[in-house]
């Protein structure tokens, strides 16, 4: 699958881009500004945009999906081009839902402790060699990214 991220530099967005790239998808992205650690992490995988800003010429019908970051404006030229071409556009939550709708989902909710509880569950599953997809609110020890998306049966969010 070929995926383009509009506003790839955010914490959640760049982790999703890294996850899709590591699973073998062709990933590109753009942003008007990218800060550390996103910048270095994207660069290490060859996903850092060559130039900052929006480039509607990089949007074509060859793209299977656009994932739209929260700070992308409604008049973003790449978004407008994708709409014009009829490319499927997802928000981050929509993309995660579509990927996980047929999986067994373990959802951690509440005001406090979501990342801690998710981390504990992931460590227990890892200890027992249970492969699972996940989305967690921070980078945790023993895991390379905040997001993992594969064909695994389970997802912890």
Residue ranges of model-derived segments:
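N-terminal leader/targeting and accessory segments in enzymes
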Residues: 1-95
């Amino acid at each position: 699958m070929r995926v383009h991220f509009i506003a790839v530099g955010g914490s959640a967005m760049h982790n999703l881009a890294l996850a899709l790239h590591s699973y073998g998808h062709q990933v590109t992205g753009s942003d008007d500004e990218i800060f550390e650690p996103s910048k270095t992490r994207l660069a290490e995988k060859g996903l850092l945009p060559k130039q900052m800003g929006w480039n509607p010429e990089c949007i074509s019908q060859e793209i299977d999906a656009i994932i739209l970051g929260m700070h992308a404006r409604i008049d973003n030229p790449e978004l407008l081009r994708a709409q014009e071409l009829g490319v499927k556009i997802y928000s981050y939550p929509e993309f995660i839902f579509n990927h996980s709708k047929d999986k067994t989902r373990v959802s951690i909710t509440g005001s406090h402790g979501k990342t801690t509880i998710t981390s504990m569950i992931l460590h227990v599953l890892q200890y027992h060699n249970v492969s699972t997809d996940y989305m967690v609110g921070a980078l945790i020890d023993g895991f390379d990214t905040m997001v993992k998306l594969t064909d695994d049966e389970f997802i912890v969010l």
